[in-house]
């Protein structure tokens, strides 16, 4: 056998060996996802507003997930911006039980707002639900396999949580959109002064309804962030018709800070 043939054969054997060694790891991560979905699904809720004069009465706004004692819910601050006490508009959270017809509706109230990081903490009534495990601060790593759960298209397809997979493509500094002149107040000015902070950039497609949903590690299920926004190619409507495939999440460390401040 020629020297070149021997070298090629050796290289091929090395490749097969590496593939065989790597295969169990990939299979393990994939096999874990169905169990994680079953575990996390009961803790993910739809967030919206209820008003007697509206049609439909429940207006979906985003996603949230249960933390701490089982009656607290984390979501994005922009998801609950429209709460209007004058018009008797109430915040409601909907707990999907796998069938939108059997969804459990809970009334909720704001416990704490962190507009600087676009986070909100709600307390909902009724019996507690399973709380999700929160990861360690600064726990996200580039290349980490992740998944997120929520209601990407709202109630259009029924209020059943949907799961998407992806990876952490970067830890990057992003500034939240600046308020308009009409929205300027003490908090808004404080947010501008704070400027940008680190976001988790995802190689995955999120949709408007995913806002406020949990981003979790694909192996452990621990929440490492809160889905926040999508990079748009054009108008807001293009998020559905021409998704960019780039999404962002707020690191869990700001959720931990918010929970500590609310105590």
Regions found by a protein language model. Name each.
Residues 68-115:
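Catalytic-histidine neighborhood of serine endopeptidases
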Residues 35-36, 83, 109-111, 125-160:
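Active-site substrate-binding loop(s) of clan PA
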Residues 28-77, 117-119, 141, 257-262:
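N-terminal activation segment of mature serine protease catalytic domains
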Residues 40-57, 124-133, 162-260:
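Active-site region of chymotrypsin-like
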Residues 67-68, 86, 140, 218:
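Short, well-ordered loop/turn sites that connect or cap secondary structure elements
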Residues 2-15:
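Bacterial N-terminal signal peptides that target proteins for export
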């Amino acid at each position: 056998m020629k020297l070149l043939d021997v070298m090629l054969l050796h290289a091929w054997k090395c490749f097969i060996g590496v593939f065989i060694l790597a295969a169990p790891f990939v299979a393990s991560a994939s096999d874990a996802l169905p169990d994680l979905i079953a575990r996390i699904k009961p803790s993910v809720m739809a967030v919206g507003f209820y008003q007697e004069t509206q049609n439909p009465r429940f207006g979906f706004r985003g996603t949230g997930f249960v933390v701490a004692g089982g009656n607290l819910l984390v979501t994005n601050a922009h998801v609950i911006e429209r709460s209007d006490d004058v018009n008797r508009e109430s915040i409601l959270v909907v707990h999907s039980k796998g069938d939108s017809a059997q969804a459990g509706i809970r009334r909720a109230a704001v416990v704490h707002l962190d507009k600087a990081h676009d986070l909100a903490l709600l307390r909902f009534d009724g019996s507690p639900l399973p709380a999700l495990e929160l990861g360690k601060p600064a726990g996200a790593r580039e290349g980490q396999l992740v998944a997120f759960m929520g209601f990407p298209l709202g109630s259009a397809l029924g209020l059943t949580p949907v799961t998407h997979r992806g990876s952490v493509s970067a830890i990057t500094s992003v500034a939240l959109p600046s308020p308009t002149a009409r929205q300027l107040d003490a908090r808004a000015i404080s947010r501008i002064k704070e400027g940008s902070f680190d976001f988790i950039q995802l190689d995955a497609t999120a949709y408007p309804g995913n806002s406020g949903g949990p981003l979790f590690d694909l192996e452990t299920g621990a929440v490492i962030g809160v889905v926040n926004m999508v990079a748009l190619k054009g108008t807001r409507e293009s998020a559905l018709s021409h998704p960019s495939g780039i999404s962002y999440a707020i690191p869990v460390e700001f959720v931990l800070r918010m929970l500590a401040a609310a105590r």
